[in-house]
Design a protein with these regions (language model features):
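Short glycine-centered, acidic/aromatic-flanked micro-motifs in structured strand/loop junctions
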Residues: 52-53, 187-189, 260, 341, ...
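N-terminal small/polar loop signature for handling phosphorylated ligands or for N-terminal nucleophile
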Residues: 36, 48-112, 200-259
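Phosphate-binding and adjacent anionic-ligand microenvironments
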Residues: 283-463
Length: 463
């Protein structure tokens, strides 16, 4: 079965039996449930819901079903067309809408699509809100509008420009310094909306560029997750010379990775680290990332006199913690930069503009900038379990076992994370598969993998 229902929305592959995949019936059900939740929450007096989508092949079909359903629920639809996730988030607040639906499966392959649900602040629903939507959908507890109260449909394609204008207006985005640096970059926008909005951003910043996979066809030229194993094309292009750096985004442009001028990966974990270092040098303060992100952010934060706090995995958890500790910047180690001066959402446009500002100020090569940060390596493993395994009980045992050791700090807000003086390991159960994900970090990849495998054996011995 490839239909996954979660607190953040619904996702699945297109085509196949009803109930097993993302099909029009389920799209109607969950869109109706979301509209019912928004109406009952009473958080906004607006009767408008924003809809934006990435360039996936199925996007037009899904968008039509979503928009028709919202109108059937009595909501006016503001369709902003092909738009990034952060653009859609901003459109909610800029238009004063009651909420928004983003049609994107993020980094998943071309056959996938999804509905991501926003509140009136343009932020993802909390776990409690998401569960409420799931409950409404399960009961099919919704009423449609009568013929005199159907919603209206409007299109507005100005939000890309408004998004870019908001980025250029940020105090720490030094447009003049970037223009004077005369950067030339190569961009892989993986045949989606990055190919629509990033040329406009780079033009505004005076950056020369070459695009790979720039046509927003939705027919992805390679696996769309911005990991080194998928980026051979742009890495080879950088190795030819003539570029200052490479820029890679995922299909909905909330994840961002850089490539050094020599064709080597900057490291997706270091996207946030590098941007945070620049922001903290100008506006000292606190930072937040999730438990599975690199320790380098903590090091950089403490260097600037701030305090680092870890949050549970998931954007809504990170933004909630950022508000709690008044963080000046935060995000996730997968290349997600959250800068509250812009908005509380991962935004690759903000990340690009801040990174280029930093590079222009420092006057160094991207590889030299990368070498200035603490060097850590993250290993990723998984423990396959039987469906009958009590994962929670195993994690409790791990917590109790290592909680007795004085040189280990145990965190259990999201699985179990064990922080050692010079390394860490994080065990998280999957919500969709009988597995435990094991993330570990150390000063070498060998040490990181060794630590991860050690904890894997501990878990196997407990079964």
């Amino acid at each position: 079965m490839t239909l996954i229902k979660s607190i953040s929305g619904i996702r699945g592959t297109i085509g196949g039996p009803a109930g097993d995949t993302l099909n029009p019936l389920d799209i109607v059900k969950f869109t109706s449930a979301y509209a019912t939740f928004i109406r009952r929450s009473g958080a906004s007096e607006s009767n408008t819901i924003v809809v934006g989508r990435d360039a996936r092949i199925s996007g037009e079909m899904v968008k039509n079903v979503v928009c028709g359903t919202l109108m059937g629920m009595g909501y006016d639809v503001l369709n902003i067309g092909l738009a990034t996730t952060p653009t859609t988030e901003l459109a909610v607040t800029m238009s004063g809408a009651a909420g928004g639906i983003i049609i994107t499966a993020s980094h998943n392959p071309r056959q996938w699509n999804a509905l991501k649900l926003l509140n009136e602040k343009g932020e993802f629903l909390t776990a409690a809100n998401g569960n409420e939507v799931l409950g409404i959908a399960e009961k099919e507890d919704f009423d449609y509008a009568d013929v005199d109260h159907l919603g209206k449909y409007t299109e507005d394609n100005t939000f890309n420009k408004r998004h870019i204008d908001s980025v250029l207006a940020l105090k720490l985005v030094d447009v003049e310094a970037i223009k004077n640096a005369h950067f030339k970059v190569c961009v892989d926008s993986i045949n989606s909306v990055g190919g629509v909005i990033l040329p406009e951003l780079l033009d505004a910043l005076g950056v020369a560029y070459t695009f790979l996979n720039g046509e927003p066809t939705g027919d992805f030229a390679h696996n769309p997750e911005p990991l080194e194993k998928n980026l051979g094309g742009i890495m080879d292009e950088l190795k030819k010379g003539g570029y200052d750096m490479g820029i890679v985004v995922d299909p909905d442009v909330d994840r961002l990775a850089f490539i050094c001028e020599d064709g080597k990966m900057f490291g997706e974990e270091y996207t946030l680290v590098s941007v945070a270092d620049y922001v903290l040098s100008k506006t000292p303060g606190n930072t937040v990332s999730n438990l599975s992100s690199t320790r380098a952010l903590r090091d950089v934060t403490e260097k600037h006199g701030g305090k680092y706090t870890a949050a549970a995995v998931g954007e809504v958890n990170v933004t909630t913690k950022m508000k709690d500790v008044h963080a000046v910047i935060g995000g996730e180690g997968n290349g997600g930069v959250i800068y509250p001066e812009g908005h509380y959402g991962r935004d690759a446009l903000v990340g690009i503009a801040l990174f280029l500002s930093s590079l222009a100020h420092k006057g160094c090569k991207v590889s030299e900038l990368r070498a200035s940060f603490p060097n850590y390596f993250i290993a990723k493993n998984r423990i396959d379990l039987t469906p009958s395994t009590d994962v929670d009980a195993i994690l409790v045992k791990v917590k109790e076992m290592y909680g007795k050791e004085k040189d280990v700090t145990v965190t259990d807000i999201d699985g179990v994370k064990l922080d050692f003086p010079d390394k860490w390991v994080h065990l998280r159960k999957s919500n969709t598969e009988p597995i435990i994900r094991v993330y570990s970090e150390a000063s070498t990849m060998e040490q990181a993998d060794e630590l991860g495998k050690k904890l894997m054996q501990v878990v196997y011995d407990m079964q």
